[in-house]
Amino acid sequence: MIESITSFGAATFGGWWPLIWTLVRAVCIILPLLLCVAYLILWERKLIGWMHVRVGPNRVGPMGLLQPIADVLKLLLKEVMVPSAVSRGMYIIAPLMVLMPAVAIWAVVPFQAEAVVSNINAGLLYVMAISSVGVYGVILAGWASNSKYAFLGAMRASAQMISYEIAMGFALVTVLMVTGSLNLSDIVNSQNRGFFANHGINILSWNWLSLLPMFGVYFISGVAETNRHPFDVVEGESEIVAGHMIEYSGMAFALFFLAEYINMIVISAMTATMFLGGWSAPIDAPVFNWIPGFFWLLIKVFLLLSVFIWLRASFPRYRYDQIMRLGWKIFIPLTVGWLIIVAIWLVSPWNIWK
């Protein structure tokens, strides 16, 4: 289907077609992403409500389904107040610097075979590079706000993101070692091989089982990277109110939250791609194979996002020193140790990734 669309477009628009096709693919990513963020927030409020034995949002529309629309309209109608003491240019550009990397990562995330905006061979390297850029927007927001609370939150955010970026990087290196490719589509395809895949049990051939410690480290580090509970000391309400966002209001404030929820979806999608077989069905059987791969990826992302929400409802916020200790004294040594084990495993006679 995609090949027929591209051939028709090339014949119709000529030299303009590559630009038009890129814009169409970008719109097809951004608009559903915004819709997913809106209803992810509703799902979060509903799920936490059920866990707290409450009802959750149920007033706007049937069963509260229009609540995200009401929230967006409320934020759009609020005035963006710019305090007089801030560095105006950097204050305004900081939310965009946080949001743009979160959106840019989706250029290389494969939704199913051949369904990717840009199927580049260095996709994994691209993800690691772009995901580390968002911290600059957070630091800029804290510094430009000219507030001690905002600056303290920005310093916490930068230290926390840098600390857990190392563990996430080592976890992804192990995936690179066992797959031998930086292309995300190749990483998904490489998980459907081996003893279990040959017998139709794809779920046991995915990387989550053979790289179980890396799977846990990557996902938990992703929770810390997104400053989500229980790692949300960056915006600890009882200490520094809203952290680096304290001087923001209206849509400028909303852009930070939009970036946070997009990053949650990014971490879930990358975890599903790296460790849970991406768009692959768990069992190689006709009853599963007729379902498009996109829906399998969607189910995995939804379950991982629900784990994000479950963590928020179940765990208390960690102290800042506990967060740093977990990253530097547990996760980094664990990932380095497992990296060495995988390297030895690959050259041994018991290599299961051949």
From Swiss-Prot:
- This one is known as NADH-quinone oxidoreductase subunit H
Query: Is Transmembrane helix one of the keywords?
Result: yes
PANTHER family per record:
NADH DEHYDROGENASE SUBUNIT 1, NADH-UBIQUINONE OXIDOREDUCTASE CHAIN 1
Biological process per Gene Ontology, one example term? aerobic respiration
Species this chain originates from: Ralstonia nicotianae (strain ATCC BAA-1114 / GMI1000)
Q: How does it assemble?
A: NDH-1 is composed of 14 different subunits. Subunits NuoA, H, J, K, L, M, N constitute the membrane sector of the complex.
Q: What does this protein do?
A: NDH-1 shuttles electrons from NADH, via FMN and iron-sulfur (Fe-S) centers, to quinones in the respiratory chain. The immediate electron acceptor for the enzyme in this species is believed to be ubiquinone. Couples the redox reaction to proton translocation (for every two electrons transferred, four hydrogen ions are translocated across the cytoplasmic membrane), and thus conserves the redox energy in a proton gradient. This subunit may bind ubiquinone.
- What family classification does the UniProt entry report for this protein? Belongs to the complex I subunit 1 family.
Which GO-annotated molecular functions does the record name? NADH dehydrogenase activity; oxidoreductase activity, acting on NAD(P)H, quinone or similar compound as acceptor; quinone binding
Q: One cellular component GO annotation, for this chain's record?
A: plasma membrane
The membrane topology noted for this protein in its Swiss-Prot or TrEMBL record is: Multi-pass membrane protein
**Could you tell me the keywords of this UniProt record?**
Cell inner membrane, Cell membrane, Membrane, NAD, Quinone, Translocase, Transmembrane, Transmembrane helix, Ubiquinone
| Regions crossing the membrane | 23-43, 91-111, 124-144, 162-182, 203-223, 250-270, 291-311, 330-350
Q: What is its EC number?
A: 7.1.1.-
Keyword hit for Cell inner membrane: yes
Q: Name the major location.
A: membrane
**Catalytic reaction equation(s):** a quinone + NADH + 5 H(+)(in) = a quinol + NAD(+) + 4 H(+)(out)
* HAMAP family tied to this protein: NDH1_NuoH
Q: From the Swiss-Prot or TrEMBL record, state where the protein is found.
A: Cell inner membrane
Check the record and name the Pfam families matching this protein: NADHdh
